[in-house]
């Protein structure tokens, strides 16, 4: 059985998921902070829009919009390579940390964008890590607060975009 082929598509918003390899110990505070630094650095380097994210102990989700000619595969490759190197240094281990592939889906409209964003932000609540999504430090939830002091304290500032009701990229 062959693995799924990935289309080389750009100029779309993608909902992506990347999982730790089976058997790796979960990520926690210091490692989440490291992932935040990686996302900021890779976004600065490659120039993609980050519209939302959540880091969980065994996986992460993000809404990423790579600008032409950048592809989602290139973005994920860079995030995973840089984070693997830094996490391995911190853990004093070698080898892959992330599963080699990732899951992605085009976001087709504003409704779907908001559903994916809500899914990400409620993930820590569903898993029982916090009672309210705003209490999970490692997500973009607080970027969408109406209080500018809360937004200013967010570890990653997300890119705010305007989508029409019938966005198709």
Stretches with model-predicted labels:
Residues 1-169:
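Short catalytic/metal-binding and nucleic-acid-binding patches
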């Amino acid at each position: 059985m062959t693995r799924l082929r990935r289309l080389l598509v750009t100029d779309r918003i993608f909902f992506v998921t990347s999982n730790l390899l089976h058997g790796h110990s979960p990520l926690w505070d210091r490692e989440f902070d490291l992932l935040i630094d990686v996302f900021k650095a890779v976004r600065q380097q490659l120039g993609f829009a980050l519209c939302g994210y959540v880091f969980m102990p065994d996986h992460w989700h993000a809404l990423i919009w790579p600008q032409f000619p950048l592809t989602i595969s290139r973005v994920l490759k860079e995030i995973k390579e840089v984070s693997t190197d830094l996490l391995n240094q911190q853990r004093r281990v070698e080898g892959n940390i992330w599963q080699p592939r990732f899951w992605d889906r085009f976001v087709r409209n504003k409704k779907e964008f908001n559903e994916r964003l809500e899914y990400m932000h409620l993930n820590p609540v569903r898993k029982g890590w916090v009672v309210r999504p705003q209490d999970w430090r490692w997500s973009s939830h607080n970027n969408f607060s109406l209080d500018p002091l809360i937004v200013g304290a967010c570890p990653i500032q997300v890119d705010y975009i305007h989508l029409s009701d019938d966005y198709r990229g």
